[in-house]
């Protein structure tokens, strides 16, 4: 099995705080891998460490066979890694079209990818001239995911896509992630275990900055002890 991403024993500090104290994970090509754990476990910091936003001080991060830790964020992104942050980083005063265009790495990316993107997110085509701030929370999340697809990324890091959304909208977001996984490998941080269990093939659990368990999602669903110990209320 080939792995698009391999993270090995990374340690990351934010200021004087030792946030990640030995996180390892593997993301197989073509998979949806869920990064699970309680609030504050280090999941978002792991994504930011992969991207170089909070560079690790120790350990290795390998993308498509090449080590990328220590590289600048824009160099890492240019290799084909897209990021959808937790708080839907869209420009509220710009139109949907302008939000998409600003995500281009090369001139014409949106034109080349438009059919693919609007097949996944037909509502965005209908709303193309509306300001981002006029969209519903679910539509803004779709736009945030679509922005990460404007360049031809092979790995998408998606942070808490269901955060703050109504159940009916969560279903729409889940369907979008399912569809895009046919075109890109996904590393998903998701606090909603039901959503993660229905989407992901594999999982890694982080507890207090350390990876503590990894495996197939189908087995985790029936592992009540692991769910209670690492994913239940603290």
Segments (PLM) and residue ranges:
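A short, proline-enriched helix->beta-strand linker immediately N-terminal to the Walker B motif
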Residues: 149-154, 183
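ABC ATPase signature
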Residues: 94, 135, 148-149
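The feature captures the beta-strand-to-loop junction immediately N-terminal to the Walker
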Residues: 36-38
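Conserved structural motif at the start of ABC-family nucleotide-binding domains
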Residues: 5-7, 20
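Conserved ABC ATPase signature
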Residues: 131-135, 139
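Helical segment within the ABC ATPase nucleotide-binding domain
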Residues: 170-183
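Helix-to-loop junction immediately C-terminal to a conserved catalytic motif
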Residues: 51
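ABC ATPase NBD coupling module
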Residues: 55, 67-88, 114, 126-129, ...
